[in-house]
């Protein structure tokens, strides 16, 4: 897995606008931008319903497991993963090698409509992440080995 790029405020603002538009058009409840190592990058919607940090980690792990399953059947990539519940469903869509879009929506909405509205959002977010990567390739963050209990290491000043 590669490194997630350092995002600037304008990147976050654009991602926020894209996720809000996705929620408005699709009528989904929550949209999460998740780094594939399991870290929540950004969220929009009604996060009071769930612990989005834990949800991001579990969603990433589930998606990564499905990707491993894909390799076992000689499939190069499963681009999305759908889980249907009694009240809510989730759709996880691959954005790029480092990130996922996770959408939580009521079951009366169809997965097809979620995929339809997610597609332009995924393209916009992928483009912005790519721009951020090009802007500062040496400023990327490798979150895969980060210890989430050691917050000091994340914010330690580099000399």
Where are these regions (language model features)?
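Acidic, low-complexity cytosolic segments
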Residues: 1-30, 37-159
């Amino acid at each position: 897995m590669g490194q997630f790029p350092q995002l600037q405020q304008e990147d976050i603002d654009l991602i926020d606008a894209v996720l809000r538009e996705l929620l408005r058009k699709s009528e989904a409840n929550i949209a999460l931008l998740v780094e594939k190592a399991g870290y929540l990058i950004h969220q929009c919607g009604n996060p009071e319903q769930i612990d989005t940090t834990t949800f991001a980690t579990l969603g990433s792990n589930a998606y990564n497991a499905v990707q491993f399953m894909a390799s076992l059947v000689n499939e190069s990539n499963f681009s999305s993963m759908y889980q249907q519940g009694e009240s809510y469903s989730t759709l996880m869509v691959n954005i790029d090698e480092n990130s996922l879009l996770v959408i939580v929506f009521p079951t009366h909405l169809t997965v097809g409509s979620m995929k339809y509205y997610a597609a332009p959002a995924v393209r916009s977010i992928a483009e912005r992440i790519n721009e951020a990567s090009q802007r500062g390739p040496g400023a990327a963050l490798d979150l895969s080995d980060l210890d989430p209990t050691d917050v000091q290491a994340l914010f330690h000043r580099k000399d």
